[in-house]
């Protein structure tokens, strides 16, 4: 039951992230073919413009994109029991009245991915000079991604007495400011080339991973759920706040060897604000005019690096939770072997598995 709840929690978080991103998604890649679009240089630095421009601060260009190999309709479905008392029109793919085949057909057999980008142009200008067209742009960019293995959805939908090799679950996010300087020019009558140099000023980065997740439920004597959880945040002034808590069973020993007590991350703190990382990138592009009707263009984007500092890392103290039932357990009070004692033991195990321990700065 605990394992089912944990799985459903992860799926719910994934679904909410997907819904939030899908609501704001506006894919503007079609602007690649619109010559009047002033920001085409963001898609290919070789593209120029027929006129000079200055953007309205902040409101000049707002772009949000979202893409993935599964969508809202794969998670939220029509309820086959709709019309019955208490049943709503829509439900999730985990509804027991939806067949496993129908519930899982929208998910990739390998990794299922969702990625998104939000780009807010703060200031931008384009002008003709120095034998070509030039652009200057200051923008705030945020990108995020999520990878969910097929086995996670399978486990959530159809938990049974078998072993599940779920694999790796990961979520990541990056936020940074970008100062970009671009120049494009005609090389020949038919060939135009351009380049853009970008300076990247990191605001923050976060990575959450659950590696090597397994749920071994085939055994008759015990069930085991395992996985290594890691949370790493790179942000100026960011720290994890830890506290000491007591186990329910005073004799329980923590993974660090402390009896009756354990340290765990309880909160986070950001002391001040500053540069969390620095990087540089280069865009290269070209456009070739075959004739008045046909043009061929190509671009290579974001060739560069980003180096983050203050990489604060936390991991789960223990990578395994073992449930071996309630054998030889009494309901009444007494020393050892009672139902309450067993529940306390499982609760303490779960605390070791689910809570994070501060590991400090992991380095660049």
PLM segments and residue spans:
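Short intrinsically disordered, low-complexity coil segments enriched in acidic
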Residues: 1-4, 11, 44, 223-224, ...
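Intrinsic low-complexity, intrinsically disordered segments enriched in polar/basic residues
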Residues: 1-6, 40, 164, 168
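Active-site-adjacent bridging/hinge elements
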Residues: 15-18, 94-98, 254-262
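Hydrophobic/aromatic pocket-lining and membrane-interface residues
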Residues: 3, 125, 136, 183, ...
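N-terminal, post-signal peptide beta-strand-biased segments of exported outer-membrane/organellar beta-barrel
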Residues: 21-142, 146, 205
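Bacterial Sec-dependent N-terminal signal peptides
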Residues: 1-28
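Outer-membrane beta-barrel porins/channels
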Residues: 28-31, 152-364
């Amino acid at each position: 039951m605990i394992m089912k709840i944990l799985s459903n929690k992860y799926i719910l978080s994934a679904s909410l992230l997907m819904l939030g991103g899908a609501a704001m998604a506006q894919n503007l890649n079609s602007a690649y073919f619109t010559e009047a679009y002033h920001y085409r240089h963001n898609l290919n630095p070789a593209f120029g413009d027929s006129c000079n421009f200055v953007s309205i601060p902040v409101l000049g260009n707002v772009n949000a994109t979202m893409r993935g190999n599964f969508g809202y309709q794969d998670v939220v479905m029509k309820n086959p029991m709709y019309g019955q008392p208490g049943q709503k029109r829509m439900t999730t793919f985990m509804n027991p009245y939806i067949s496993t085949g129908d519930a899982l057909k929208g998910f990739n057999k390998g990794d299922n991915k969702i990625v998104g980008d939000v780009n807010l142009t703060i200031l931008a200008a384009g002008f003709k000079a120095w034998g070509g067209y030039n652009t200057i742009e200051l923008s705030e960019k945020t990108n995020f991604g999520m990878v969910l293995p097929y086995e996670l959805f399978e486990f959530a939908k159809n938990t049974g007495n078998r072993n599940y090799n779920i694999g790796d679950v990961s979520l990541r996010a990056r936020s940074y400011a970008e100062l970009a300087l671009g120049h494009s020019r005609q090389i020949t009558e038919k060939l135009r080339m351009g380049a853009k140099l970008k300076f990247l000023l990191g605001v923050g980065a976060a990575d959450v991973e659950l590696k090597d997740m397994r749920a071994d439920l085939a055994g008759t004597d015990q069930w085991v759920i395992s996985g290594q959880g890691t949370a790493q945040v790179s942000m100026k002034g960011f720290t994890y706040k830890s506290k000491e808590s007591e186990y329910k069973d005073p004799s329980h020993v923590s993974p660090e060897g402390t009896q009756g007590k354990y340290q765990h991350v309880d909160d986070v703190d950001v002391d001040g604000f500053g540069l969390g990382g620095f990087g540089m990138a280069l865009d290269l592009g070209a456009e070739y005019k075959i004739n008045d009707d046909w043009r061929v263009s190509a671009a290579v984007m974001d060739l560069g690096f980003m180096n983050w500092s203050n990489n604060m890392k936390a991991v789960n103290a223990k990578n395994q939770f073992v449930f071996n039932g309630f054998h030889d357990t009494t309901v009444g009070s007494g020393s050892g072997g009672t139902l309450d004692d067993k529940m306390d033991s499982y609760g303490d195990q779960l605390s070791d598995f689910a809570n994070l321990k501060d590991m400090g700065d992991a380095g660049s």
